[in-house]
């Protein structure tokens, strides 16, 4: 009983220290599209931050590829940040942005299933094993440090094998987001006997839409949108600061990947000119499923004070993330970008309606033909030959 009380008191101390570290100010804190008034809502702020899934270095997992490393300490921080961004997208997809986590409280089955996607086992679809081995197809050796764009490309390819979450992952190119390409990728016909074939001709679709019918009404595949950027040469250009902060205010925000060379962080919000981030640079022991099939999640939530960094100390190479569960969410995001991002004289990125004529034709990514199922698809790097090697756009200097 004393040990239980001691543990509880220690937790109270952590929370108190956390709350006292934030200044008594009237400024708003923005966390992934939600605002908190620091002076009166510190406990809500704590609850919101601690609800984010926190992935860190792990040790004592099965060797990657059978003979590779059994810990990602020292090299896996950007992969862990990518996991955190994707996990937030899955939380929004299945549980909603307003879902909250409480320690030792029974959680929805969807939460447990999301968590199991990221366990450090080769049969988990977004495990460190799968990400590291998929990185080989992006020119990265297992155990080599990744940049944000490489992680984005890896997530895009792994998502093709993830039928349960069924995400469309779009990674922008040349600082440009193309609306036409995203809608082509995300609009899918309902799976039925009548609509399982090819998409109807444009003329027929337009005709039905004009009549207000739903005979060929398309469904929307939830979108994970990642925008890799370079916001300066050696340091972030101050002209981008306001636009960068605006992205954390958008309801579609998944935060940003970035940090400093060889030190990746997952940025989830800001207070004034300070960015708030979750730090993966803590090495914890591998956690597996228990006998009842659940995962002990106590080490997957950060109950200590998240760190802060002045935005001007951020390395200029970053990747923004956004989640659009429905088409209306994407349309709203486009409106916000046009209002808040494109108004700047020096734009952080471009949003265009049509596919640029000088680009290669856009082909929505498709699952390669490999004779495996689900998350078990990569057992060796030989299978990576099914993927085309994309140009490596490393955006954090090593």
Curated annotation (Swiss-Prot):
GO biological process: aggrephagy; autophagosome assembly; autophagy; lipid metabolic process; mitophagy; piecemeal microautophagy of the nucleus; protein delipidation; protein processing
GO molecular-function term, one example from the UniProt record: cysteine-type endopeptidase activity
Assigned GO CC terms: cytoplasm
Keywords from the named record: Autophagy, Cytoplasm, Hydrolase, Lipid metabolism, Protease, Protein transport, Thiol protease, Transport, Ubl conjugation pathway
Predominant location: cytoplasm
Record: active site: 77, 279, 281
Pfam family, one: ATG4_LIR
Regulation: Inhibited by N-ethylmaleimide. Redox-regulated during autophagy since reducing conditions activate ATG4A whereas an oxidizing environment such as the presence of H(2)O(2) inhibits its activity.
Claim: Cell division is one of the keywords in the record: no
EC number(s) recorded for this UniProt protein: 3.4.22.-
InterPro entries linked to this entry: ATG4_LIR, Papain-like_cys_pep_sf, Peptidase_C54, Peptidase_C54_cat
The reaction(s) this protein catalyses: [protein]-C-terminal L-amino acid-glycyl-phosphatidylethanolamide + H2O = [protein]-C-terminal L-amino acid-glycine + a 1,2-diacyl-sn-glycero-3-phosphoethanolamine
Locations listed in the record: Cytoplasm
Superkingdom assignment: Eukaryota
Chain ranges for the short sequence motif LIR as given in the UniProt record: 393-396
Assembly information from the UniProt record: Interacts with ATG9A; the interaction is direct.
Domain remarks in the Swiss-Prot or TrEMBL record: The LIR motif (LC3-interacting region) is required for the interaction with the ATG8 family proteins. Required for proteolytic activation and delipidation of ATG8 proteins.
Function field: Cysteine protease that plays a key role in autophagy by mediating both proteolytic activation and delipidation of ATG8 family proteins. The protease activity is required for proteolytic activation of ATG8 family proteins: cleaves the C-terminal amino acid of ATG8 proteins to reveal a C-terminal glycine. Exposure of the glycine at the C-terminus is essential for ATG8 proteins conjugation to phosphatidylethanolamine (PE) and insertion to membranes, which is necessary for autophagy. Preferred substrate is GABARAPL2 followed by MAP1LC3A and GABARAP.
Stated family: Belongs to the peptidase C54 family.
Protein name: Cysteine protease ATG4A
Record lineage: Eukaryota, Metazoa, Chordata, Craniata, Vertebrata
């Amino acid at each position: 009983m004393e040990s239980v009380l001691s543990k509880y008191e220690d937790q109270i101390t952590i929370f108190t220290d956390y709350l006292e570290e934030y200044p008594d100010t009237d400024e708003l804190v923005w966390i992934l599209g939600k605002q908190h008034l620091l002076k009166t809502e510190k406990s809500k702020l704590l609850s919101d931050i601690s609800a984010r899934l926190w992935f860190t270095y792990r040790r004592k997992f099965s060797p990657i590829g059978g003979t590779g490393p059994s810990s990602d300490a020292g090299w896996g921080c950007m992969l862990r940040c990518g996991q955190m961004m994707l996990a937030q997208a899955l939380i929004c997809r299945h549980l909603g942005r307003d879902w909250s986590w409480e320690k030792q409280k029974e959680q929805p089955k969807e939460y447990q299933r999301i968590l199991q996607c990221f366990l450090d086992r080769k049969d988990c679809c977004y495990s460190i094993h799968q990400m590291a081995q998929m990185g080989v197809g992006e020119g990265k050796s297992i155990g080599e440090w990744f940049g944000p764009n490489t992680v984005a490309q890896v997530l895009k390819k792994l998502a093709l094998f993830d039928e349960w979450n069924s995400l469309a992952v779009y990674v922008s190119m040349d600082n440009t987001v193309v609306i036409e390409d995203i809608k082509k990728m995300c609009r899918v016909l309902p799976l039925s006997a009548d609509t399982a074939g090819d998409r109807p001709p444009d003329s027929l679709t337009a005709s039905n839409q004009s009549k207000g019918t739903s005979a060929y009404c398309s469904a929307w595949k939830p979108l994970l949108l990642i925008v890799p950027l370079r916001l300066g040469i050696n340091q972030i250009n101050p002209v981008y600061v306001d636009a960068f902060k605006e992205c954390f205010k958008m309801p579609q925000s998944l935060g940003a990947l970035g940090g400093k060379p060889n030190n990746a962080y997952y940025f989830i919000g800001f207070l004034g000119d300070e960015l708030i981030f979750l730090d993966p640079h803590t090495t914890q022991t591998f956690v597996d499923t228990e006998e009842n099939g659940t995962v002990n999640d106590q080490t997957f939530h950060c109950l200590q004070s998240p760190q802060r960094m002045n935005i001007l100390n951020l390395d200029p190479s970053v990747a923004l993330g956004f989640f659009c569960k429905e088409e209306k969410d994407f349309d709203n995001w486009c409106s916000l970008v046009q209002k808040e991002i494109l108004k700047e004289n020096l734009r952080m990125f471009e949003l265009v309606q049509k596919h640029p004529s000088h680009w290669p034709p856009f082909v929505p990514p498709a699952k390669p033909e490999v004779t495996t199922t689900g998350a078990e698809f990569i057992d060796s790097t030989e299978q990576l030959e099914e993927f085309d090697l994309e140009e490596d756009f490393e955006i954090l200097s090593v």
